Regions:
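C-terminal catalytic-base region of ester-bond hydrolases, centering on the histidine
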Residues: 76-80, 93-103, 237-394
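Extended, compositionally biased low-complexity polar/Lys-Gly-rich tracts
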Residues: 102-113, 122-129, 215-236, 342-345
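A composition/secondary-structure signal for short, hydrophobic, low-basic-content segments
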Residues: 47, 164-167, 368
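Serine-dependent carboxylesterase/thioesterase catalytic core
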Residues: 136-273
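Active-site catalytic motif of lipid deacylating hydrolases and related acyltransferases
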Residues: 48-159
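Hydrophobic, Leu/Ile/Phe/Ala-enriched alpha-helical segments that form helix-helix packing faces
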Residues: 34, 109-118, 150-154, 180, ...
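N-terminal low-complexity, Ser/Thr- and acidic-residue-enriched intrinsically disordered segments
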Residues: 2-81
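A generic short-segment signal for beta-strand/edge and adjacent turn/coil regions
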Residues: 12-18, 94-96, 191-194, 209-216, ...
Length: 394
């Protein structure tokens, strides 16, 4: 996407600016790597780990719904709000206890990351976390939270920040690049559509951007590693310093090796479970797959009028024209495109040699979560870190 992307959406199929790189990874290839270059060469002083969808403190919007009902029924407000707060407190720890490092960043992952890089940079899990809900507002809120963190905990003058995120966290990073470019009219429209007045982090970031130059000075200090991020929001090239995508991929067609096997017609179940063509979830989560919670439905419709405004009307063949409703019909056409790569940044399409390790449910790590879970595993972290460091230094 261009400079001054103005919150435009990527297209299906996408048109990568740089040629994707395909390669195979071995779990032991980073054994002798000197990771000090992250600090000495790339000047990274902080690494922020951000989990993806459904791994947050309110992934299905239950707490949000309870709070919305509480506003409408004052007599029950106290009880409902207490229930909501209890859910927010307990959901993330429960999820982490069940998933471990499969599709999720947790404390053992952070500790291993810190061991690899030494005392500098500092490696942090995002705290407080984000909801993990699967819609525009949740990802927009994450982008604002990340920006707000930089306001309340500024980087040192000579430091850069590496954002290291999984799945739709990467799409929050994309929104952040549009915010950092700070095209005043489109940023104002973004805040108006989100309608989050009264939320401290939203108010603080909006006020700050209104007073800041364009692009924001922080833009040149943001490096991004996006793992398994679905192709959604456009990246603004004035809103970051460097960007690399790491996606589990196995080519299906030698004539178009960077495309994935189209998800429509559907894959055979065994091919999905065994990640025969790589990360199925990353290819699945295109525009049209969001799920709004009850309290966010209207706001998400408003945000879609900005964030999906440039998605074209789609032409349908015999295989899709009778599918109802229109949203599903259009999503099927997008799945047919086999879109794997992002328009901007360096797309690293990686296949994994089997490590021999198994997930808690007995699946090979490389097949976990339909090929989506390997990106966050401690076992593959050294190799992933070497891959990212080398790419950022190109």
């Amino acid at each position: 996407m261009p400079a001054e992307n103005r919150f435009l959406h990527q297209q299906y199929p996408s048109d990568p600016l740089n040629d994707p790189v395909l390669r195979t990874l071995n779990v032991n290839e980073a054994a002798e790597t000197d990771f000090s270059k992250l600090h000495t060469v790339l000047k990274i002083g902080r690494i922020q780990l951000v989990h993806g969808t459904f791994m947050g403190d309110d992934p299905f919007g239950i707490a949000d719904t309870l709070k919305a009902v509480a506003e409408s029924v004052p007599l029950l407000a106290g009880q409902l709000n207490r229930m909501a707060e209890a859910l927010l407190e307990k959901t993330r720890p429960f999820t982490t206890s069940m998933t471990g490092d499969i599709g999720n960043y947790h404390e053992p992952y952070r500790k291993r990351f810190q061991e690899l890089v030494g005392d500098d940079p500092q490696v942090e899990l995002l705290s407080p976390t984000w909801s993990g809900q699967n819609h525009h507002l949740a990802r927009a809120d994450l982008a604002i939270r990340l920006f707000h963190q930089l306001l309340i905990r500024p980087l040192l003058p000579d430091q850069n920040l590496l954002l290291w995120g999984h799945s739709h966290a990467g799409n929050a990073f994309a929104l952040l690049t549009n915010l950092l470019t700070n095209h005043k009219p489109s940023v104002a429209e973004f805040f108006d559509k989100a309608a989050q007045e009264g939320q401290t982090h939203w108010d603080d970031v909006r006020t700050h951007l209104e007073k800041s130059p364009s692009p924001h000075p922080l833009a040149s200090r943001i490096l991004i590693a996006a793992f398994a991020t679905p192709v959604r929001y456009g990246w603004d090239t004035d809103g970051y310093a460097r960007l690399v995508h790491i996606t589990h991929h196995r080519p299906v067609d030698d004539a178009a090796p960077a495309r994935t096997k189209p998800l429509f017609p559907p894959h055979l179940p065994g091919d999905v479970i065994n990640a025969r063509w790589g990360d199925w979830v990353q290819a699945f989560a295109v525009a049209g797959t969001d799920v709004s919670s009850m309290p966010t439905r209207a706001i998400n419709q408003n945000l879609a009028s900005l964030l999906e405004a440039n998605l074209p009307d789609l032409e349908h063949g015999l295989d899709t024209r009778l599918i109802m409703p229109k949203r599903v019909r259009d999503t099927c056409v997008r799945w047919k495109s086999g879109t794997r790569c992002h328009s901007d940044g360096l797309n690293l399409l990686v296949d994994y040699e089997p490590s021999g390790d198994l997930s808690p449910i007995g699946r090979p790590l490389e097949q976990s979560l339909l090929g989506h879970g390997v990106a966050t595993t401690v076992r593959w972290l050294p190799t992933h870190l070497k891959l990212v460091m080398d790419a950022l230094m190109l």
